C-alpha cells in the first residue's frame, strides 16, 4: 500500500505540531481512573440499596457513565508503556477489569492490529466490519446485541475459564476466539505465546471473582437486587459503547487495503462545541480520527492537539473532513447510507 503525498503531508504536519504533547501524565491517568472507579462503585452501591426511585436512577446513571469511562481506559493501556504510568495496568485490572470480568489482555495484543496500516479495514482487522453495507435490521441487531455483553463475560469467567484449565483444546479455543474485544467474528488471536503468566493470573482472578459473586448470591449474602442493578448498569454501558463504535468510523470499506488517507477519512472526530461527546466517547474516544493519525498521543492531550491542528492546518486540509457534529447526526448518516446502499443493491439487475 503506497503512501500518497497527502498521507505523508498530513501525518508529518500533525506530528510536528504535537510533538510536545506525546508524553503521558501518570498523575492524570491515576486521578482520572481513581475518581471514575469511586463514582462507579459509589453510584452502584446507592442505586442498589436506596429506597428512592429518583435517587436510585440518578445514581445508576452516574455509575453507568463512570463505569463506561473507567472501562474505556483499557484502550489507553494498549498505547502506553508500563514505565510511563507505573502500576497503572495492575491498578486498572483491580479496580475495573477483573470486577467487570473484562481484563486488560482481552484488548492488549488485539487493538494494536487495528492500527497496522495494511490490516486496517481488511478482513484481518479485529475491529472493522463493512457496517454501512449491512441491512438496517442487521445493523440494529449489531447495536442491541451489546446489551448481552455482561452475560457473555459471566459465562466466560464462571464456566469456560475453569473448564479450559481441564480441557486443553477448550483452553486454546477460549484464548483464540473468546478472549478479545472485537467486532469481527472471523478474527482469531495468534499471540498465544505472549503473557502466559499474566493470562493465567487474569483469568483465574475473573474466575474466582465470578464464583464469589455467585456464591454470595446463592447464600443470600449478596441480594438479587444488587446483582440485577449491576447487570443493568453494565449492560447500558456496553450499549452506549456500541453506539459510539457505530460512529467511530464510516465503515465503508469492504475488505480491501486502504491508503492512509482513506483510513483517516473513514475515521471520525466529534469535537467541541459538542460537549456531550465527552460523556458518550470518553477518555479521548471522541477524537477517533486524530487517534488514528497519532496513535501514541495520550488522551488528556487530544483536545489541545485537535485545537492546534484546526488552527494551523489550512481550510483545504484533509483533517477538517473527519469531523461529525454529534452522535445522533453521525448515527443518522450511517443509517441513511445503509438504506441507500441496500436500495442500490435491490435495483441492480440480476445476472
From Swiss-Prot:
InterPro entries with a match to the protein in the record: FA_desaturase_dom (IPR005804), Fatty_acid_desaturase (IPR012171)
Transmembrane feature ranges: 26-46, 47-67, 141-161, 204-224
Keywords: Cell inner membrane, Cell membrane, Lipid metabolism, Membrane, Transmembrane, Transmembrane helix
Record's subcellular location: Cell inner membrane
GO cellular component, one term: plasma membrane
Membrane topology (UniProt): Multi-pass membrane protein
Family: Belongs to the fatty acid desaturase type 1 family.
Protein name, per record: Ceramide hydroxylase
Amino acid at each position: 500500500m503506497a503512501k500518497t503525498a497527502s498521507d505523508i503531508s498530513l501525518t508529518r504536519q500533525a506530528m510536528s505540531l504535537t510533538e510536545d504533547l506525546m508524553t503521558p501524565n501518570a498523575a492524570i491517568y491515576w486521578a482520572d481512573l481513581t475518581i471514575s472507579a469511586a463514582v462507579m462503585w459509589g453510584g452502584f452501591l446507592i442505586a442498589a440499596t436506596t429506597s428512592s426511585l429518583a435517587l436510585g436512577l440518578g445514581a445508576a446513571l452516574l455509575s453507568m457513565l463512570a463505569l463506561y469511562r473507567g472501562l474505556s481506559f483499557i484502550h489507553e493501556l494498549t498505547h502506553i508503556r508500563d514505565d510511563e504510568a507505573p502500576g497503572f495496568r495492575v491498578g486498572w485490572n483491580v479496580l475495573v477489569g477483573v470486577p467487570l470480568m473484562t481484563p486488560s489482555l482481552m484488548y492488549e495484543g488485539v487493538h494494536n492490529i487495528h492500527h497496522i496500516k495494511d490490516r486496517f479495514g481488511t478482513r484481518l482487522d479485529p475491529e472493522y466490519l463493512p457496517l454501512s453495507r449491512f441491512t438496517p435490521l442487521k445493523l440494529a441487531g449489531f447495536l442491541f446485541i451489546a446489551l448481552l455483553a455482561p452475560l457473555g463475560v459471566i459465562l466466560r469467567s464462571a464456566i469456560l475459564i475453569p473448564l479450559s484449565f481441564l480441557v486443553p483444546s477448550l483452553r486454546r479455543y477460549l484464548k483464540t476466539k473468546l478472549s478479545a474485544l472485537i467486532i469481527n467474528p472471523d478474527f482469531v488471536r495468534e499471540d498465544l505465546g505472549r503473557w502466559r503468566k499474566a493470562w493465567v493470573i487474569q483469568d483465574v482472578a475473573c474466575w474466582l471473582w465470578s464464583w464469589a459473586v455467585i456464591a454470595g448470591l446463592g447464600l443470600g449474602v449478596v441480594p438479587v437486587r444488587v446483582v440485577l442493578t449491576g447487570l443493568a448498569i453494565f449492560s447500558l454501558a456496553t450499549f452506549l459503547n456500541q453506539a459510539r463504535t457505530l460512529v467511530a468510523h464510516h465503515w465503508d470499506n469492504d475488505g480491501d487495503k486502504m491508503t492512509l488517507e482513506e483510513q483517516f477519512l473513514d475515521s471520525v472526530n466529534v469535537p467541541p462545541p459538542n460537549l456531550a461527546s465527552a460523556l458518550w466517547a470518553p477518555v479521548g474516544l471522541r477524537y477517533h480520527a486524530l487517534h488514528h493519525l497519532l496513535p501514541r498521543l495520550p488522551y488528556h492531550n487530544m483536545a489541545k492537539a485537535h485545537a492546534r491542528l484546526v488552527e494551523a492546518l489550512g481550510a483545504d486540509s484533509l483533517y477538517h473532513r473527519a469531523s461529525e457534529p454529534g452522535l445522533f447526526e453521525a448515527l443518522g448518516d450511517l443509517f441513511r447510507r445503509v438504506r441507500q446502499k441496500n436500495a442500490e443493491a435491490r435495483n441492480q439487475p440480476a445476472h
